[in-house]
Amino acid sequence: MIPRKPVSRVIALEEAFLHPRVWDLYSESLRRKYQPVRARLNDVGTGRIRLMDAAGIDMQVLSHVQPGIQMLADAQAELAVAVCREVNDWLAEAIAAHPTRFAGFAMLPTLSPRDAADELERTVRDLGFVGALINGHTNGRYLDDPAFDVLLARAESLGVPIYIHPTDPPTPVSDVYYAPFESALVPTWGWPVETGTHVLRLICAGVFDRHPDLKIIVGHMGELLPYCFTRLNVGLTMAGWLLTPESDNQAMRNNVGHYLRRNVFITSSGVFDVPVFDCARAMLGLDNLMFSVDYPFQDNFAAMEFLRRCDLAPDDKERFAHRTAETLLRLDNRPPATRAAATNFGDAWYGLRARTQSKVGRALISALVKS
């Protein structure tokens, strides 16, 4: 018996593309890194949709692959503004061609925080984007830097989240922590530590007290934060960081858990382990968890098999797969009309991949993608 898709709708939130204008700005090392998946990154049309259909994924929220334009020097702020506008307009056209299959996170010129805030507002109000994705720090400046308050306030007022995606740590940190093993340790360990630290900086700086309705998303099942939840909750309070009558010089008005549960959402991008999911659910609650793949660096079918294996009641699985994302991103919660005719087709291919890794199965899927 071929297993059917485990839920009625699936939305994936950390799904990358690559724009030619940004490719032209990338260094040779970045080009070598992305060359093996460049064709898939470039495709925001029918080829990508065929792969989504084959796995049973209804919608991708698209964002530019890291580091976007955040690798530019501080003196290139005007270039960053122009490139972001060009890329976001291009993405809006791709979404308009397939509005039931794609949504968009804006790429922002964080070299100039006020311009970043203005571009966020433009893309949300004029282009219908559902938030922004920022690749960690910008030349060593994190979002708790007071200069970024204008951007955070704008996101809060617009009611859209900011997705913080991993990037390499600042070079001095990487040199001390990871050399000479950077290529192995930075993507696997350095990125989660870097991104989890970014969120903790926001908490300790009082960002969520100043902006209580601001929402942040992080991927990879929480970037180590759920695992460290209790230690952070207890440790920062014991260290006197919590604002109390006896310690009134710190900015944090509540414990860490309060902010993680109120202001931070996490996705399953690239982490398809049920025990890790169970830890995140226990620490943050299911309402803070959303499905993602991390395409094209992770496999759509592996992500869907993980979704099938999650030990959730049917309604809870629907929340994780799409309902929480629909609410947070204010997406249309009706199943896409274009999906209805392909449901049985997509279920069949999902079942084929879930059931077998044979050469025949791979050949059939390859033929589907190329057709």
Kindly give the residue locations of the regions a language model identified.
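Alpha-helical scaffold segments that form or flank carboxylate-/histidine-based iron centers
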Residues: 44, 77-78, 106-115, 119, ...
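Aromatic/hydrophobic pocket-lining residues that form the small-molecule binding cavity
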Residues: 45, 84-88, 116, 120, ...
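Surface-exposed, active-site-proximal loop segments in enzymatic domains
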Residues: 28-33, 66-80, 114, 183-184
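Short glycine-enriched loops at secondary-structure junctions
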Residues: 17, 65, 110, 166-174, ...
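Mid-to-C-terminal alpha-helical segments outside catalytic/metal-binding sites
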Residues: 1-13, 17-59, 89-97, 118-122, ...
